A protein has these predicted regions:
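Proline-glycine-enriched beta-turn/loop adjacent to the NAD(P) cofactor-binding site
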Residues: 18, 60-66
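A conserved pocket-lining segment of Rossmann-fold NAD(P)-dependent short-chain dehydrogenase/reductase
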Residues: 69, 78-108, 112, 116
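Non-catalytic, hydrophobic alpha-helical segments
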Residues: 109, 113, 129, 190, ...
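Glycine-rich Rossmann NAD(P)(H)-binding loop
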Residues: 65-67, 93-100, 127-135, 145
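Active-site Tyr-X1-5-Lys
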Residues: 22-25, 31-61
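Mid/C-terminal beta-alpha module of Rossmann-like enzyme folds, strongest
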Residues: 112-175, 211
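Conserved Rossmann-fold NAD(P)-dependent oxidoreductase catalytic core, especially the SDR/UDP-sugar
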Residues: 1-38
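Amphipathic terminal alpha-helices
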Residues: 176, 185-219
């Protein structure tokens, strides 16, 4: 649309997601957890197909709140769980006990994205922006529950998902694929992809600030 309108721009910066780069088995078709991932990937394809469009694609893992201020978007996976935990509604969770998440604080992601985007050599390239290491989901939950002064939920098998009330599942179902798998993006390779592990603040300390900010806003 911008091109048809005759607008001049230096380049498009597309924020995709690292989850479009799932490792596939031989002869396995690319699949997506949801339409969010699918549309992010389709947008990537469009940028690569259109001629004379300068672009840079950024693929973050799970973006959390600001590690300094604790500000957190209401659409975040972390926010949804904090809400349920704070109300003592999440009593069971059907995930593996060793599940882990790759979380990057939004300020760390944005700072690195701006640094990459300021360089001409990043035009036409795709970058993975993820944390140096995953964080155990159990550790995150236990820390959150301790800060919120509530009992942590019980981890149950996936077969026991029917034990969770529908009104709770409807809030977390879309996030289940992410907390059921321990994706380590830094070990993935794909032609034309640059893996970047920017300096990131500690996820647990970030969680402290997020919950402190959340609790203060509810007073």
């Amino acid at each position: 649309l911008a091109k048809k309108a005759g607008l001049k721009f230096e380049r498009f910066h597309h924020i995709s997601t690292a989850y479009v780069n799932r490792q596939l088995r031989k002869n396995e078709k690319r699949s997506f957890n949801n339409t969010y991932e699918q549309t992010k990937f389709e947008a990537e394809l469009l940028f690569r197909q259109i001629e004379n469009i300068p672009y840079t694609i950024y693929r973050p893992s799970i973006v959390s709140g600001n590690s300094v201020t604790g500000n957190l978007a209401a659409s975040s996976i972390i926010y949804k769980f904090i809400i349920l935990l704070s109300r003592n509604l999440l009593r069971k969770l059907p995930i593996d006990s060793d599940a882990s998440l790759n979380i990057i604080p939004v300020n760390n992601f944005v700072n690195k994205m701006l640094a990459i985007g300021s360089k001409k050599e990043s035009i036409g390239k795709t970058y993975h922006l993820t944390h140096q290491k995953n964080t155990e989901f159990r550790a995150l939950l236990e820390q959150a529950c301790s800060l919120l002064n509530v009992e942590p939920p019980e981890f149950v098998s996936r077969q026991q998902i029917e034990d969770i009330p529908n009104q709770i599942m409807q809030h977390i179902e879309v996030f289940m694929p992410y907390i059921r798998q321990s994706q380590k993006f830094e070990f993935q390779t794909e032609e034309g992809i640059t893996n970047i592990l920017p300096p990131c603040d500690n996820v647990i300390s970030t969680l402290h600030n997020i919950i402190h900010n959340f609790s203060s806003s509810k007073k």
